[in-house]
Regions:
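Short, surface-exposed recognition loops and adjoining beta-strand edges that mediate ligand/DNA contacts
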Residues: 27, 55-78, 168-171, 201-220, ...
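Long, intrinsically disordered, low-complexity segments
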Residues: 15-16, 112-115, 189-191, 212, ...
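Membrane-proximal, proline-rich intrinsically disordered regions
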Residues: 14-69, 94, 247, 533-543
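Flexible, polar/acidic helix-loop-strand segments at domain edges
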Residues: 89-90, 94, 353-436
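Glycine-rich, aromatic-lined ligand/substrate-binding cores of catalytic
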Residues: 50, 287-291, 295-394
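Conserved, well-structured interaction surfaces
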Residues: 34-56, 80-162, 174-210, 410-433, ...
């Protein structure tokens, strides 16, 4: 049994004579570079987005995005009468009461390892084609660099969520040989892989239409290298329950023939991204427009097109009230909303909009949220009961059943420009889903400088001045808040809270939150089905 079957527990490729999507005969594939690129490289991009639950890095429900977002102080999924109880799933996420028997967590693990396995498979066959002289050395290096980069990215997400994980790079690895590696070892592997492949990756912009649209290019690798170094204290810690982390100033990387500490490494790779021409867009919303492939800020996206791609974009349509969606032409589900603490961070401290001071409200609030009176194409929306639909951003609780705000409590996700040509359920939009962008790079650079004893004021000022906000001192606390204001709904909040040591704190309305005095919940459990499949696997601490 190979890695795909052993780790994912799914009916993946179980024999090395099977071939990827495309179903070309081996003899034909050996004579065609185009087939190799399509079936062994291009096919892997089908798995970055998704069209079913727990599949895709973003866009689908109950997967990587929800485990990294609904578990935080950023957003929540209140129970609304008969809707969104879902066997207590969302309540478990918000209160950190997940267990090793959570099927959704198991599905997320399987998805991540399915893609890793497919990458290993592609590398195996690319190697075979090289030795049959189908590929030139340049083609071989380019293809393997791209696949290794993708594999490293999926290992990044897997390590970030699950800590000590199996690190398998050989497609022929038998189950009996599969064991977990310490998180620090996986971290160094990912970092070294990205460093090794970066010179062989194209420097083209992955977010722009063209031959490298949506592909893993050099700036994507640089972004991940910066993100890894920024979290080096977390990822170098193999015992996350003892309350002790290594100091980033004493964690070193070999970069450009120099030894740099973690924070210096972050700054180095952020500068590399700048040198490739990435800049902030003049208007924040351009990054999330229907045709956001023109953004000079977006670094890596999931391509979306309601005619060409089956990737789903569930988050907005699951958030909006049914009447709101109906006015747009979508079938929406009235679910997720922002938390009260998020509203407070944006300056919303009074539920009556007529009493608010607009000067105290962050300008990004109006792009990130639907709140107060709902307008569609400038027209007020009827809530279905003869009233104007109004969202109440501060009327939020874990369970709104029976509340006057059961249907309209909480500010809802906006962020992306409304695409009125999307499919009826609002999922197949033309806005590309943004995974990595340059504003994050500036905030990473600012944070690294502060952690290294310097000033990150210039970088933080760039981000805030773009949205015409007042200057704030670039302290660590202010940078964490700025990351919420800038990156709301983008899937980074869990990662940020863990790095700042705040993930286990009691968020607003978490009345049933688990008490975690050791930090064990900063890593998710290995699910029971995975443990039973492979007796070499060991459960993470605390579960």
């Amino acid at each position: 049994m190979i890695l795909g079957t052993a780790m994912a527990g799914m009916a993946l490729t179980s024999c090395l004579d099977e071939y990827p999507k495309g179903e070309v005969e081996e003899a034909e594939a050996y004579t065609s570079v185009a087939y190799i690129e399509r079936d062994l490289v291009g096919d892997l991009y089908n798995y970055i987005g998704g069209d079913s639950p727990s599949h895709g890095l973003q866009g689908t429900i109950r997967g990587v995005y929800d485990w990294n977002s609904v578990t935080t102080d950023e957003q929540m999924m209140p129970v609304r009468g008969a809707d969104w109880d879902d066997g207590g799933f969302w309540n478990r996420l918000y209160n950190h009461r997940w267990t090793s028997s959570d099927g959704e967590l198991s599905s997320t693990w399987k998805y991540l390892y399915e893609v890793i396995s497919r990458c290993n498979r592609s590398l195996y066959f690319i190697d075979r084609y090289r030795y049959r002289l189908v590929l030139t050395n340049e083609q071989y290096e380019a293809f393997t660099a791209e696949v290794r980069g993708l594999r490293a990215m999926f290992y990044f997400y897997t390590m970030d969520m699950f800590g000590n994980i199996p690190l398998v790079t050989d497609y022929n690895t038998p189950v009996s040989d599969i064991r977990q590696s310490p998180r620090s070892e996986v971290f160094r592997f990912i970092f070294n892989e990205l460093q090794e492949v970066a010179p062989y990756l194209k420097s083209e912009r992955s977010n722009e239409l063209g031959n490298y649209y949506g592909r893993f290019t050099r700036p994507v690798a640089y972004f991940l290298l910066a993100k890894l170094a920024l979290n080096a204290e977390v990822y170098s810690d193999n015992d996350w329950t003892d309350g002790i982390r290594p100091d980033g100033r004493s964690i070193y990387f070999s970069v450009d023939e120099k030894q740099l500490n973690a924070w210096e490494t972050v700054v180095y790779y952020c500068q590399e991204i700048y040198d490739l021409g990435y800049r902030l867009e003049e208007y924040y919303g351009t990054n999330f427009a229907i045709h956001n492939e023109v953004s000079k800020e977006n670094i890596f996206v999931i391509p979306m097109d309601n005619n060409l791609y089956s990737n789903r974009f569930n988050y907005i349509f699951r958030s909006l009230h049914a009447a709101h969606g109906g006015a747009i032409g979508w079938g929406t589900e009235n679910g997720t909303c922002a938390t009260v603490s998020t509203m407070n961070a944006y300056g919303i401290t009074e539920d009556n909009p007529s009493k608010r001071d607009p000067g105290e409200i962050d300008s990004r609030y109006y792009i990130n949220f639907h709140s107060d009176t709902v307008l569609v194409k400038g027209q007020k929306v009827n809530d279905g009961y003869g009233n104007v639909l109004v969202y109440h951003p501060l009327e939020v609780a874990e369970n709104l059943t029976g509340s006057p705000f059961e249907r309209n409590g909480g500010a809802r996700m906006a962020k992306y420009e409304t695409d009125f040509t999307a499919s009826e359920d609002g999922t197949l939009q033309n806005n590309d889903i943004v995974l990595f962008r340059y504003a994050d790079v500036l905030l990473m650079q600012a944070e690294a400088k502060v952690r290294n004893g310097g000033s990150g004021q210039e970088e933080m000022d760039f981000v805030r001045s773009r949205v015409h906000e007042k200057i704030r001192e670039a302290t660590l606390d202010n940078l964490l808040t700025e990351r919420l204001l800038e990156l709301m709904w983008e899937g980074w909040r869990r990662n940020d809270l863990i790095r700042f040591g705040k993930f286990t704190e009691l968020y607003d309305h978490r009345v049933n939150a688990v008490v975690d005095n050791t930090g064990y919940t900063t890593v998710f459990p290995i699910t029971g089905d995975v443990l039973s499949l492979n007796p070499n696997m060991v459960q993470n601490p605390g579960y």
